[in-house]
Amino acid sequence: DTIHRIHPTCGMVVPSFLIKLIEFAEKNQIDHNTCSMKKCVCIGEALRNPDFTLNTLGQRISEKWPSLQLYSTYASTEMQSSFTECSEFHGGHLQPELIIVEFLDDKNLPVKVGEPGEVTITTLGVEGMPLLRFKTGDICYQYTEPCACGRNTIRLSSVLGRKGQMIKYKGTTLYPPALFDILDDIPRVKNYVVEVYTNKLGTDEIL
């Protein structure tokens, strides 16, 4: 009703809500592709894989609403700023006048480009609670090559996972979002709970 009443062209939304909005429109025989919405700045959930392709959630939205442009963001309350995609959709751009970002390993040393690291920030525009090398706990890649849009600042990948949530399973390491993408890709799975525990041998098990 609000969309039809005020005719917005852009919205800021959690991607999962877009899925619910699409389902509501289909259930009520509303053609959401003809509404005024053309772009959405998405918060709270990842839309893309590290190679910039849409993940399962992003694909589901794009398939149902192909005319809607989806822009990913990365932000936190502590930053009071965000990394936001441009129209090239190749990672979130750093705003260097607002924040300094580092990507650190477990020893607090900078990782090499192409290696995942913990996003660590120093705020420049926050007066009430400035932060120096604040560890977010989020693991991301950094991209340093110039973007096709013309900007040459560091860009940020989608979040691979939380540092404390890394799972060691059958000789490899992974983060919960990788499991969620697999489950989200199964049409008949609507809701799920993933349980991870350590067995008697000291290795992780996934249910």
Feature names for model-found ranges:
Residues 1-207:
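Active-site glycine/GP-rich loop and adjacent strand/helix microenvironment
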